[in-house]
């Protein structure tokens, strides 16, 4: 049976703004308070989805969250009508209003961790929504994330959904941004690779000093248990604390994997040789041949990697066995990074082609091509069981483009978030979107 790796990209929400909410994310912090363009952001994301579909990849779409999150503000003590809640928050606690309006759910690499059926004990695809407890504005996402994923992957014969881990620092979980999977074929058993920044309970593990480590070893282990993974199909690796302090807040900012290949920076991990040996050995027992592509610090510094988002790229398998790297425009703008990529594709290795996309609106908030997608490996039967409304087609692309043009503003500043009209605009748009994507009622305003 044929299997696919399907990329489900996050649709950028109507409140996309530069709130500077993510400490440890250099781009997010440095572009704080600038005027954003939600319409352009959403269209840039849709163009990437359509381009991958046109290249022959199966492409899906993941709906944004309801924002402003009035329920979250009510939980923090604001009351009255929805408009009054927003006005009170704007007057007395503007940072809370900004957080409740964040469109960060577009970065669906943080939505969940996904294990395909070939790896799990019960032969189903498993999803665990990420608690994202390190940042308040993201910690409020997982209830809606779970409902949206449940509406997309509803058939319990094929799909299993787990609630987010306990919302405490010891189980900080950032989802697929710290997880990848190596395999010979998407439909065969593989090795799941969990990357953590610190241990919550074992002080022998080093930790970053400047920025927080958002993923714990204990969270990764819990997800592996929930998904019914075997020990011989799992590798845990610690990210280098020094690169976290340099702005590498998720592993997908310093490494990307696909198939049998890990593309990573020389400084990405601790105990790199041991980690590579374990990956090689475990994948070898499953009939695969693990290969690594290391980018030397002498050619690309960590600073250049963070600035260009070289590793926050999509590594995709072509039908001929070669690989394609999808990178943001910022890679072409960085002379050292672009020179490295030109040499990489000319070397005759597995990565034969680089395609560049303009994702400036997302990039300025600290999210590149890899942040915008959640990978789900599915066999033909499972793909047929996915809600067809969320699979990208040419007609769906046209419909969503028209939907964005109709509902989204082309400029948004922090002061605009206090406008009660924005709430009505967003709810009207999302109500229409759930009909387009055939999701049913998934948003709080539709349920309560």
Swiss-Prot record:
Name the job this protein performs. Answer: Catalyzes the hydrolysis of N(2)-succinylarginine into N(2)-succinylornithine, ammonia and CO(2).
Enzyme Commission number, as recorded: 3.5.3.23
User: InterPro entries this protein is in?
Assistant: AstB_sf, SuccinylArg_d-Hdrlase_AstB
Using the UniProt record, name the top-level EC class of this enzyme in a single word. hydrolase
What positions constitute the catalytic site? 174, 250, 371 (nucleophile)
What pathway is this protein a component of? Amino-acid degradation; L-arginine degradation via AST pathway; L-glutamate and succinate from L-arginine: step 2/5
Q: Which organism is it from?
A: Pseudomonas fluorescens (strain SBW25)
Q: Which GO terms describe its biological process?
A: arginine catabolic process to glutamate; arginine catabolic process to succinate
What family does the entry list?
Belongs to the succinylarginine dihydrolase family.
PANTHER family named among the record's database cross-references: N-SUCCINYLARGININE DIHYDROLASE
Q: What catalytic activity is recorded? A: N(2)-succinyl-L-arginine + 2 H2O + 2 H(+) = N(2)-succinyl-L-ornithine + 2 NH4(+) + CO2
Q: Which UniProt keywords apply?
A: Arginine metabolism, Hydrolase
Q: In Gene Ontology terms, what is one molecular function of this protein? A: N-succinylarginine dihydrolase activity
Q: What protein does this entry describe?
A: N-succinylarginine dihydrolase
Encoding gene per record:
astB
Binding locations of substrate: 19-28, 110, 137-138, 214, 252, 365
Q: How does it assemble?
A: Homodimer.
| NCBIfam families the record matches | arg_catab_astB (TIGR03241), PRK13281.1 (NF009789)
